[in-house]
C-alpha cells in the first residue's frame, strides 16, 4: 500500500515510529507537510500538489495534524477523502475533537461523565459562572490551548474572578471547569484504536503542578483500567467519530470523567510506559480497514 502521513515533523517520535512500522510491513510511505500542499478542487479529478507536482494516488492517509494548523490541515485531509483515500481518522472527527467546547457538548449529550463545565461571554456573568461549577478552586481553560498551555488553576474566588476578567478583556475564548481535587494531579490516558483500548497509562503531575501533561514534566506509568473506564474511553472516541484517540480521564468520586479527546495522541509516552508497539497496531488497523474501503468501492 502507498501511505501518506500528514505531519509537519518528520523527526518527531510518533511520525518516525509510524514510518518504521509501515516500512517493516512492506508499505511505501511518504511524510507530507500539509502546509506545503495546495489543492485543485474540481468535479472530475480533484488533486493535491506540492512543489509544482501532483502527489498522485495514495491508498491510505494517517493524519498527524498539529493543533495550530487544524484549519488548513483538515482541508488537505478532506481533499484526500474526496479523492477516495482511506483516512484512519476523518476530518470531521478531528474538527470535533479540536473544538474543546463542542466536544464537551457532544459528550454531554451522550451522557458521558464530564467535569461540570461553564461557558460565558460577559464579565457580568462571572459570579454565576463560578457558582455554576461549584466555586473555587476551579480550572480556567483557553479553548485554543494544547499540552497544558492556557490552563489555569484558580485556587480562590478572587483569583478566579481576576483570571476570568483578564481573559475576557483579551477577548479570549475560555471555559471554566470544576476542579477534581480527588484526582491528586493524576490523569489516565487511554489509547483507543477502533473498538478497543489497546494501551493505558497514568500520568502524574510533578510536585507543585496540577497539570499532568508529559510536556509539563509529568511522569507516566502503566495503569490497569476498570471496565467502566474502558467503556467511557470507547464511548468518548466513538462520539467524536475517531478511530484513533487519546482519551484523558480523571478518577473522580462520581466515576471517570473525560477531560479531553485527542485526535493525534503522541506515541512516545504510551509506548515507553506500556512497552506496547502502538505504531504497529495502528498500521495493522489501517491495513485491515483500508482494504475493506477499497473492496467496498469496487
Curated annotation (Swiss-Prot):
Binding residues annotated for ATP, in chain numbering: 141, 178-179, 187, 211-213
Binding site for Mg(2+) 2: 260, 262
CC cofactor note: Binds 2 magnesium or manganese ions per subunit.
Cofactor: Mg(2+); Mn(2+)
Binding site for Mn(2+) 2: 260, 262
Keyword presence, S-adenosyl-L-methionine: no
Binding site for Mg(2+) 1: 248, 260
InterPro entries, per the entry: ATP-grasp, ATP-grasp_RimK-type, ATP_grasp_subdomain_1, RimK, Rimk_N, Rp_bS6_RimK/Lys_biosynth_LsyX
Protein keywords: ATP-binding, Ligase, Magnesium, Manganese, Metal-binding, Nucleotide-binding, Protein biosynthesis
Record-level GO cellular component terms: cytoplasm
Residue span, ATP-grasp domain: 104-287
A GO term, aspect molecular function: ATP binding
Sites where the protein binds Mn(2+) 1: 248, 260
EC numbers on record: 6.3.2.-
Alphabetical GO biological process terms: protein modification process; SOS response; translation
Family affiliation: Belongs to the RimK family.
NCBIfam families: PRK10446.1, rimK_fam
Name of this protein: Probable alpha-L-glutamate ligase 2
Organism: Shewanella frigidimarina (strain NCIMB 400)
